[in-house]
Amino acid sequence: MEMRDVYLRDGTFTGLSIPKHTPMKPGQYLLHSIIIMKTADGQYIMQQRSLKAKYSPGEWDVTGGGVLSGETSAEAAVREAKEELGVEVNPDSLVHMLREITMWGEEYGMICDTYAARVELPETGFRISEYEVNDVKCVPFEEFLETVTYNKTEGFKDMLIRADKLI
């Protein structure tokens, strides 16, 4: 059973860990991690969510997921890239770009850390997790920006523009 650590809104660990999908209580936040991956030739990797996904099935988006109990958001970013796409990310190449809070109810939500990194495409091609990913492609920055910001904040869009110049 996957466990998640519970945090306060300011990112302080409460000492509590709960099973994935446990209903949240007021003042509780889970940690989530996103990784923006730019290839050596300047393309961006984006994935199409599984058609069976609970949230946003079939939509093209960035790679990411929940941070497991005892894991940092940076470790989760590296793990998610490997699990979902088979992409190896050097942890030393990660650049922390943004921390945002998303409310799921009036008094609880998610703390989301976004990282950016240059990556090498897998020599044997992407190995997608069919449970989470339907398809994957590499696209120019403009297409990536337009596609993945449909449900994101202006701060996220601004961060992507900064990341493009940084990585």
Residue ranges of model-derived segments:
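The catalytic Nudix box helix
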Residues: 45-46, 62-96
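Residue-level detector of beta-propeller blades
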Residues: 13, 96-97
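Acidic, metal-coordinating catalytic segment for phosphate/diphosphate chemistry
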Residues: 1-34, 40
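Short loop segments at secondary-structure junctions
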Residues: 10, 39-42, 50, 118-123, ...
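Nudix hydrolase/Nudix homology domain
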Residues: 21, 57-58, 98-100, 106-167
